Design a protein with these regions (language model features):
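Protein kinase glycine-rich loop
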Residues: 16-23, 28
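Conserved N-lobe loop of protein kinases adjacent to the ATP-binding glycine-rich P-loop
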Residues: 32-39
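Activation-segment/catalytic-loop signature of the eukaryotic protein kinase fold
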Residues: 80
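Activation segment signature within eukaryotic-like protein kinase domains
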Residues: 117-118
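Protein kinase catalytic-loop region centered on the HRD/HxD motif
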Residues: 121-133
Length: 189
């Protein structure tokens, strides 16, 4: 079992610096690539999930679905690894705030602000869909916005790829209720 903490080195290469976010499946850490010196993000499986093959498979699927995707509005996945029943994804560190935080701070965003962010997200999703991947959890908290107004779509944790075996049972719904497409909400997708 791997317990994420500052100073831990993954794959003899990525040193964890500080935790920056928590999710249902993992913790996201600011980390340093010891080979290049680059600061990256490391999504590390939560320790209590170590050894759980279902969650490890979801992390593998997330890495596989996001790894080859390249677009200015997608957070780039750089590496993936496993040890001791746990796993991690190394990705580009995106500096910014979740769109959900911007909305909470400012209320309704004017069209001049929100429309460019939505257009950027749509362009990212076009690349994702052309690669045969369905994100399945597009929501404001999975869109980071930097100081220059660049939006980055992240978190492919429940994504589905073409020719992949489903990770859900028939009729099982994955995603965030408020943001589900109608066909997802009814279990038809």
């Amino acid at each position: 079992m791997i317990k994420p903490e500052a100073g831990l080195v993954l794959q003899d290469r990525y040193r964890l610096i500080e935790r920056i976010a928590m999710g249902g499946m993992g913790e996201v850490w600011r980390a340093q690539d010891l080979r290049s010196g680059r600061v990256v993000a490391a999504k590390v499986m939560r320790p209590e999930l170590a050894g759980d093959e279902l969650f490890l498979q979801r992390l593998r699927t997330e890495a596989k679905n996001a790894r080859g995707l390249r677009h200015p509005n997608l957070a780039m996945v750089l590496d993936y690894g496993e040890a001791d029943g746990s796993g991690w994804i190394i990705m580009e560190l995106v500096q910014g705030k979740p769109l959900s935080e911007l909305i909470a701070e400012k209320g309704t965003l004017p069209p001049s602000v929100i429309l460019p962010l939505l257009a950027q997200t749509a362009r990212a999703l076009q690349v994702v869909h052309e690669a045969g991947v369905v994100h399945r959890d597009v929501k404001p908290s999975n869109i980071l916005v930097n100081q220059e107004g660049l939006a980055k779509l992240l978190d492919f944790g429940i994504s589905s790829g073409a020719n992949q075996l489903p990770m859900t049972a028939t009729g099982m719904v994955m995603g965030t209720a408020q943001y589900l497409a109608p066909e997802q909400a009814t279990g038809a997708a």
